[in-house]
Amino acid sequence: MAMRSHYCGLVTEALMGETVTLCGWVNRRRDHGGVIFIDLRDREGYVQVVCDPDRAEMFKTAEGLRNEFCVQVKGLVRARPEGTTNDKLKSGQIEVLCHELNVLNASVTPPFQLDDENLSETVRLTNRVLDLRRPYMQRNMMLRYRTAIQVRNFLDKEGFIDIETPMLGKSTPEGARDYLVPSRVHDGEFFALPQSPQLYKQMLMVAGYDRYYQITKCFRDEDLRADRQPEFTQIDCETSFLDEEEIRAIFQRMITEVFKTQLDVDLGEFPMMTYQDAAFRFGSDKPDLRVKLEFTELTEIMKDVDFKVFSTPATTKGGRVVALRVPGGSQISRGEIDQYTEFVKIYGAKGLAWIKVNEVAKGRDGLQSPIVKNLHDAAIAEILKRTGAQDGDLIFFGADKEKIVNDSIGALRLKVGHSEFGKANGLFENRWAPLWVVDFPMFEHDEENDRWAAVHHPFTSPKDGHEELMVTDPANCLAKAYDMVLNGWELGGGSVRIHRADVQSKVFDALKISPEDARAKFGYLLDALQYGAPPHGGLAFGLDRLITLMTGADSIRDVIAFPKTQRAQDLLTQAPSPVDEKQLRELHIRLRNPLAATQG
C-alpha cells in the first residue's frame, strides 16, 4: 500500500466520500469537547483531520501529538459541518475523519512558532530547516520551482538547448573578486568559480550551438546588499544570428508569459529608454517608473549665481545641478527634511538644499528657504518655471559631481516616492513598471587608476559606427547593451558580443590590457573568434531577483532555500569554517594567521 495517496492541501470536495492516506506535520492540535482536531500541513497546504474517541487506540495516539510531529493519517473525506467551513483554504469545505493514525517521527519543541511573523533573520537562518516549513517560505519555493519549469519549457519551444559549462574555470581579475579554488595537482595554481558563463557560452556560439541556455549558479566575492548573494542563480542565454531587437523580443515575451501564468499579471508594454535619458531624468540606469518624480536640469542657469554650492559644480567639468520638485511637499516637516539630508550623505552628498514654495505669484517673497537670499531673481524665476512649481510644493536640489548628484538625488527620489507621504499624495503608482534601458556607454573612466573600464564587460560590441570612438573618444562610445528593468530592479542584462578578433583586440587596447596580458588571459577566446565566429548576443536574468519581485519578499534571502547572510555566512551549517591542517598541506597552503581562522 502506498504511504500517501494525496497531498493535504489538495484534498477538496472532489474527493468527498473517498478514503485518503495523508502524510504531513502537525501544525496545530485542538481538543474540543472530547473530539481532537488536527491541522495537518504539507507543502501544498492544510487539511483538518478529526479524531473521534470511538476509535480508542487512534484517539490515544492523537492525544499525544504535539506541533511538528510527522504523522500518517488514513481517513474518510466528508463535508465540514455547517458554519465551520474555511474559504481561505483549498480544503476548507471538507475534513478528514481519521480511521488510522501513525506517528512517523516525534518532534522536540521547536524554538519558535512557525506562524510567528516577527522572527529575526538570525533565528530564521540558524533554524532554516524549520523556517522552510513555514507556508510563506513554501509558497516562495514553489513559485521559484514553477517559474524555472516554465522558463525551461519556453526556451525549449524556442529552440534553445541546455548545455552545462564548467564550475572550475580560469580567474579573470578585471571584474568583481573571484572565489578561488586551489589545485592540489598543480601546486600554486588556482581555479576560479564562475562569475558568469560568459566566455564559455560565446565559444558555444562559435561551435555552432546557436541557441544555448542554462539555469546555473554564479559566484562573486563582493560586498553584500539586500539583493546580492555570494552565490546566485542565473538564467543564462545566448543566441547567434539575431540582432538586439530580436533578442529583446524573445525575452520580453518570456518574462511576460511568466508573469501572466504565475501571477495573472499583464505587464503590458515595455517602454524603451536610453541610458543617457534614464540618468538625466532619474539619476539611475534602472529607474523605478512607479515613482512620479523627475529631475529638472539646472546646471546652465546656476553658472552665474553667487551661491558657490551651486555655481562651483555648475562651472566645473563633470559637475551637475538638478532640482527635484515634490508636489505638495511643503507639508514635509523640517525634521523630516533633516532626515533626508542625512540620507543623501550616504551617497556622497555634502548636504541637501531645499525651497518650500508657499506662493508662486510672489516670487522670492513667496518662498521659504535658507538659500533664497543667495540666488538672484532671474535664477529664482527660472527655477520656478523649469520645475513647474506650484503653491505648496517642495523643491530639493543636488549640486556636485554628476555621479554624486545622480546617486544621491536618485535615491532621494525613491525615498520620497515610496514614503507614506509619497503614497498618500499620488507620487507613487502601485503597478508593475517594466522597461528596457538601452545604449549604455561602452566605457566608464576609472579616476583612481586614470584608465577606461568596461561598463558591462570587455566582450560587449560597440554600436554600429562607434568602433573608431573606442580610440578617439571613448567617453562617447556607446555599446549594443540592454537591461530589462522592473520596478527599479535590474531583472536581466545583456548585449550583442564582439564576434571579430580584431575588434576584440581593439577593446583590450582601449582598456589598456596589453597584447601579452590579453593573450595570457583570453587567448582561447581570441583564437576561437578567428574560426568564422557568428554574430551573437545574449542576456542573463537573475532568478533570485525575479522571484523576489514576483513574491514581494523583503529580502532575496526569502526566495533561496539556503542563503548566506550579509556577512557571507551560512548560519545553518556554520560555513565558512576552518579546515584540517592536513587538507591545507595537500593543497600546498599555509595560513599567515592560523589563530584568526580558528576564531572566525
From Swiss-Prot:
Aspartate: region residues: 198-201
Chief subcellular location: cytoplasm
Residues carrying the site annotation Important for tRNA non-discrimination: 32, 83
Gene3D superfamilies for the chain: Bira Bifunctional Protein, Domain 2, GAD-like domain, Nucleic acid-binding proteins
Keywords, sorted A to Z: Aminoacyl-tRNA synthetase, ATP-binding, Cytoplasm, Ligase, Nucleotide-binding, Protein biosynthesis
A single GO cellular-component term on record: cytoplasm
Name recorded for this polypeptide: Aspartate--tRNA(Asp/Asn) ligase
Organism phylogeny: Bacteria, Pseudomonadati, Pseudomonadota, Betaproteobacteria, Burkholderiales
Gene: aspS
